[in-house]
Amino acid sequence: EDLHQITRIIKKHYPGLPYFMLGHSMGSLAVRCYLKKYDRELDGLIVCGCPGKNTMAPLGTALIRMLQTTKDPHSKSRLADSIFANMFDRPFRAENLIHAWICSDRKVVETYNKDPLCNFTFTLNGYESLLWLMRQTYSRMGWRVRNHKLPVLFVSGASDPCLGGSA
């Protein structure tokens, strides 16, 4: 619904212009959830770096909810970070570089790692929201497709660990 509010604001300020949406990674989940209900609002959609369906999402949700019984939902958890955030680094352990999975160019990853705006971890609520988006994205429930001619571009790397590819 947040994306729909943004859509309404943008269309009010820029009436008559085509409206495209781009979602990357977690944002790709959000735009696909948006698409279920508001496909008529869009003139085009670009979906990039799409996380694949994760059959462990219900178990992850249960773990996060269990952790929230003892911690504030807006607090961080090393356990949750080690399970969720670090799972993409595991195939790249030999490179001895955190976030090596984001790019094959080591210098790009080093620059990313030094940027304080890039080095954050989710709160428990953030992980729960991510898992909710994943479940909603891959659920067959709730689709009200009305814009059958909507152009949609999906872009992902063949070895993207988010998509389930092997590095």
Question: At which residue positions do the language-model features occur?
Answer:
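Alpha/beta-hydrolase active-site loop
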Residues: 1-11
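Short, proline-enriched alpha-helix->beta-strand connector loops that line the catalytic pocket
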Residues: 146-152
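Active-site nucleophile elbow and catalytic-triad environment of alpha/beta-hydrolase enzymes
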Residues: 123-144
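Short beta-strand/loop motif that positions the catalytic acidic residue
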Residues: 154-156
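Alpha/beta-hydrolase-fold enzymes
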Residues: 31-117
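Alpha/beta-hydrolase fold nucleophile elbow
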Residues: 14-25
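Acidic catalytic loop of the alpha/beta-hydrolase fold
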Residues: 119-120, 159-166
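Glycine-rich nucleophile elbow surrounding the catalytic serine of serine-hydrolase chemistry
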Residues: 23-33
